[in-house]
UniProtKB/Swiss-Prot annotation:
Similarity comment: Belongs to the adenylosuccinate synthetase family.
Documented EC number(s): 6.3.4.4
Protein's name in the database: Adenylosuccinate synthetase
PROSITE patterns in alphabetical order: ADENYLOSUCCIN_SYN_1, ADENYLOSUCCIN_SYN_2
Pathway: Purine metabolism; AMP biosynthesis via de novo pathway; AMP from IMP: step 1/2
Role according to the record: Plays an important role in the de novo pathway of purine nucleotide biosynthesis. Catalyzes the first committed step in the biosynthesis of AMP from IMP.
Binding site for substrate: 300-306
Principal subcellular localization: cytoplasm
UniProt xrefs under CDD domains: AdSS (cd03108)
InterPro entries: Adenylosuccin_syn_GTP-bd, Adenylosuccin_syn_Lys_AS, Adenylosuccinate_synth_dom1, Adenylosuccinate_synth_dom2, Adenylosuccinate_synth_dom3, Adenylosuccinate_synthetase, P-loop_NTPase
Organism: Colwellia psychrerythraea (strain 34H / ATCC BAA-681)
Amino acid sequence: MGKNVVVLGTQWGDEGKGKIVDLLTDKAKYVVRYQGGHNAGHTLVIDGEKTVLHLIPSGVLRDNVKCLIGNGVVLCPKALMTEITMLEAKGVPVRERLLISDACPLILPYHNALDVAREVARGNKAIGTTGRGIGPAYEDKVARRGLRVGDLFCAETFAAKLKEIVEYHNFSLVNYYKVEPVNYEEVLADALAVADTIKKMTADISEILDQARIAGESIMFEGAQGTLLDIDHGTYPYVTSSNTTAGGVATGCGVGPRHLDYILGITKAYTTRVGSGPFPTELDDEVGNHLGTVGHEFGATTGRERRCGWFDAVAMHRAIQVNSVTGFCLTKLDVLDGLETLKICTGYKTEAGDIITVPPTAAEGYDKITPVYEEMPGWTESTVGATSVDVLPENALAYIKRIEEITGIPVDIISTGPDRVETIIKVNPFL
């Protein structure tokens, strides 16, 4: 029998999910995206060649894998075609490997315009969105006025629905945000120009997954962003607009939650965050600079510099709790090479002097807390490219063991570099 494995981020995104998905897909028949949109940035390095994917599942580079985009993903037609063109230029037959739910909400130019206009209007209270229209597209979905992939396939009906929604959003753009309206005719023409191409790749994703399960195939569900950016469980309001947690798998592609066998939580050996929002262990010193420089901490989607800090076991408590994490994949262990002392945040100290080990539920709760650290010795030896725990420095092994002890979750996979071969697999989730 096959296994259904969920790969998701347990921090604020950028944990290295793309590499791990690509690595493990040699055991999977299907790779499924179930939430988010082209705000994701999954970087794959294979034989030294880097590929950055934003929308298409990371398994697309494997010729034995079918890639599915579930209904929980908001889909930008322009971004999809750009990514297809990029991959085809590399010789990847994307259209043979990709299937898309016709229930995916569409991201159209007015969503981008709204996203950018709102961030500008917020000023120094900006959330730090990618400006790619993700949030406004999810808003339209919840308000039941959004257009979906399936709407593209009837031009007359699509045109009528589009006209109504463009007028609705243009009113806000012009009268409230004082920016230029989007052009209805241009939006219509651009959308219909790719309708036939997209139609050839649409399918009933829920049915495909159910039949695959019955046939005993192995399926991987690829998360985007990270748990602490979840719309419900993250550091609200500094969050994304979808459910990035394991529960999003069931709703985002129509698979029953009872059929999920293993939840692999991807976590860096330290912590990073892009954009605004609470970050208790953030470092503004030489160590923070070391993590950012050695770890190449720049967003794959936006190019923005990531904020860096120590491993936060308190925030991780929430991620483990809401995801039922089975095992960790600890990434970027090699970035810690050369640091004399390492720290793990094991608690937050409140203004009253109490130590809490469960994080606040909203951003405001972080305003008056300070991290409590446990110190450990670092190591001078290189871990870059290690493929066996036997070659890891003693202090690196002690650091990993301490993370396991504090969190209660085993570290089943360790990443020691960007290439898929630079990995230590102690336990393969599919075996």
